[in-house]
Curated annotation (Swiss-Prot):
Biological source species: Desulfovibrio desulfuricans (strain ATCC 27774 / DSM 6949 / MB)
PANTHER family hit by this protein: 54S RIBOSOMAL PROTEIN L1, MITOCHONDRIAL, LARGE RIBOSOMAL SUBUNIT PROTEIN UL1M
Coiled coil: none
PROSITE patterns named among the record's database cross-references: RIBOSOMAL_L1
Transmembrane segment boundaries: none
Name of the protein described by the UniProt record: Large ribosomal subunit protein uL1
Biological process per Gene Ontology, one example term: translation
Subunit structure: Part of the 50S ribosomal subunit.
InterPro entries according to UniProt: Ribosom_uL1_bac-type (IPR005878), Ribosomal_uL1 (IPR002143), Ribosomal_uL1-like (IPR023674), Ribosomal_uL1/biogenesis (IPR028364), Ribosomal_uL1_3-a/b-sand (IPR016095), Ribosomal_uL1_CS (IPR023673)
Protein family per UniProt: Belongs to the universal ribosomal protein uL1 family.
Amino acid sequence: MPKHGKKFRNALEGTDLQERFSVEDAVGKSLGAAFAKFDETVDVAIRLGVDPKYSDQMVRGAVTLPNGLGKTVRVAVFCKGEKQAEAREAGADIVGAEDLVAEVKAGNLNFDAAVATPDVMALVGQIGRLLGPRGLMPNAKTGSVTFDVAKAVSELKAGRVDFKVDKAGVLHAPLGKASFGPEKILGNLKALLDTVNRLKPSSAKGTYLISMAISTTMGPGFKVDMTQVKKFLEG
């Protein structure tokens, strides 16, 4: 059994971590348990009723959170010609093609998200093994492989979150900073859940949203009473 510090124990005093809460209470308790000296990120973990080993049950997408993420997102754009100027004007931090691929191969991955135009994807594929494990590989399904680089950059800067289920069928996503307060976090969560629901595979049978937990960077996970989720989304 891992030992936790005094601040952690104090934050959980009187709380049963096996209890399930309404969405609003789970967020509130998570924020109340944020004790770190830095502004912790609020995260959600959602277990879906899908089997990702089947390609038609892979849930993957993107959502622009209405209240952003509360952090500066460094965006790299792989493109050529006039698209480079378009990307820079939209606020891209790093722009290039062969030169940018060479930088990544050298170990310089000082960006948080990447966009690529379709005509350079063969080039970007050379560094897929470096980008993929970090969640940085551009993907058409999330809108990061596109000729409309200005739109993609603007969305990423505004707080777009790319997500996909892992091998266990669990989807992880950030919802913003603890300093946002409950209203903004709940607004971001609603936008995420609406998007995830729209992406439900037709081949997925039974319950789709199985379980959910809200946590902060250093805090515990507070489980959500899934019978309350529909009410939250309709509210």
